[in-house]
Amino acid sequence: MKVAVFPGSFDPITWGHIDLIKRSLAIFDKVVVLVAKNKSKKYLLSDIERFTLTKDVISSLNFLNVFVDSYSGFIVDYALINSIKFIVRGIRAFNDFDIEFERYLVNNKLNFKIDTIFLPSSAEHLYVRSDFVKELMRKKDVDLSHFVPELVFNRLKSKFIDK
């Protein structure tokens, strides 16, 4: 069975993430969506909120063989512990590639047996970023349906609009 881990902060999960998960399923038998905990990053949502929201969205989409987990260490360590040989990373633009390629090089030094698969974003999701979602949520009456599922919008609404 070919298994991949798709790590991210998912603060929040977007249609871009979901597209990459769906496309990963065409390559791998099982995909673990890993909600990463990075102590140096500042998140809008708590670790539990990011995990729960990601899990709820994945459940609502009825994906088979997609599982949600969380981890606070190096992704290659998670992969090794769970016998996963592939890490999937999404690439939107050239600057993403530079960052992700550096991550790949570091991961490869830590464990050369775990490979990284780069998936370019679909054209309709090239501009979708969690940061943009958080920025746009500050505006009232904004349509975010191109960025996030309704479930995500409704959860974020309580953090922004309902205050």
From Swiss-Prot:
It catalyses: (R)-4'-phosphopantetheine + ATP + H(+) = 3'-dephospho-CoA + diphosphate. Its main location: cytoplasm. GO terms for molecular function: ATP binding; pantetheine-phosphate adenylyltransferase activity. Its EC number is 2.7.7.3. It is an enzyme of class 2 (transferase). This is Phosphopantetheine adenylyltransferase. InterPro entries: Cyt_trans-like (IPR004821), PPAT (IPR001980), Rossmann-like_a/b/a_fold (IPR014729). Substrate binds at S9, K41, I75, R89. It is found in: Cytoplasm. Homohexamer. Keywords: ATP-binding, Coenzyme A biosynthesis, Cytoplasm, Magnesium, Nucleotide-binding, Nucleotidyltransferase, Transferase. The gene is coaD. GO terms for biological process: coenzyme A biosynthetic process. Pathway: Cofactor biosynthesis; coenzyme A biosynthesis; CoA from (R)-pantothenate: step 4/5. Reversibly transfers an adenylyl group from ATP to 4'-phosphopantetheine, yielding dephospho-CoA (dPCoA) and pyrophosphate. ATP binds at S9, F10, H17, G90, I91, R92, E100, H125, L126, Y127, V128, R129, S130, D131. The record marks H17 as: Transition state stabilizer. Belongs to the bacterial CoaD family. The keyword Magnesium applies. GO terms for cellular component: cytoplasm. It comes from the Bacteria. Its cofactor is Mg(2+).
